[in-house]
Curated annotation (Swiss-Prot):
InterPro entries: Ptrans_KptA/Tpt1, RNA_2'-PTrans_C, RNA_2'-PTrans_KptA, RNA_2'-PTrans_N
Protein family: Belongs to the KptA/TPT1 family.
One example of a Gene Ontology biological process annotation: tRNA splicing, via endonucleolytic cleavage and ligation
Enzyme Commission code: 2.7.1.-
Signal peptide limits: none
Source organism per UniProt: Clostridium perfringens (strain ATCC 13124 / DSM 756 / JCM 1290 / NCIMB 6125 / NCTC 8237 / Type A)
One GO MF term attached to the UniProt entry: tRNA 2'-phosphotransferase activity
Keywords carried by this UniProt record: NAD, Transferase
Name under which the protein is recorded: Probable RNA 2'-phosphotransferase
Function: Removes the 2'-phosphate from RNA via an intermediate in which the phosphate is ADP-ribosylated by NAD followed by a presumed transesterification to release the RNA and generate ADP-ribose 1''-2''-cyclic phosphate (APPR>P). May function as an ADP-ribosylase.
Keyword Transferase attributed: yes
Length: 186
């Protein structure tokens, strides 16, 4: 299965974040899916897919998208859901600034409306410019936004930190957002 890992990982992401019904399943309230159920569902498209394959995909995923429960009987995505799940995240004080990478085509709307979660449960923010830039490049002409997370936190906006170190919040009002000059950053 190794040569299909990237494709399978994207499919697992779709199932665990957005559409478990693709394989006839439903996530529990905390976003978990039974590992054996997932493997059985994946075998409909990827014959021979095994627990070893799943463990390798989780272990080698550079973004840390997935995690097992303690006994590895369940698996879930660490963040990025468009369906309602309770990840059990506790509010936490963020660093002074966080970053958001996006495409230039979205900048006007963001500067007018702030960062909104759209179909996801949270707005995703990065602790460093490099990570934000990797995310943003997927959306076309790169724009990096600096978010004054310290002021947001002091104004009562809650932040959460996912298991794979993605900062999450419900909304970033426009007054806390500043576009960075990429020539000065890189």
């Amino acid at each position: 299965m190794k040569n299909n890992d990237s494709k399978i990982s994207k499919y697992i992401s779709l199932i665990l974040r957005h559409k478990p019904e693709e394989i006839g399943l439903k996530l529990d309230e905390h976003g978990y899916l039974g590992v054996l159920d997932l493997i059985e569902g994946l075998n409909k498209s990827y014959e021979g897919f095994s627990m070893d394959d799943l463990e390798r995909i989780v272990r080698e995923d550079s973004k840390g998208r997935y995690s097992f429960n303690e006994d590895k009987s369940k698996i879930r995505a660490n963040q990025g859901h468009s369906i309602k799940v309770d990840l059990g995240l506790e509010p936490i004080k963020p660093p002074k600034v966080l970053y958001h990478g996006t495409g230039r085509k979205y900048l006007e709307s963001i500067l007018k409306n702030g960062l909104i979660k759209k179909e996801r449960n949270y707005v995703h923010l990065s602790k460093d410019i490099e990570t934000a830039s990797i995310v943003g490049k997927r959306h076309g002409d790169l724009v990096i936004l600096e978010v004054d997370s310290e002021s947001m936190f002091n104004d009562g906006i809650k932040f959460y930190l996912s298991k794979n170190n993605v900062w999450l919040c419900n909304y970033v009002p426009k007054k806390y957002i500043k576009e960075l000059n990429l020539e000065e950053v890189f």
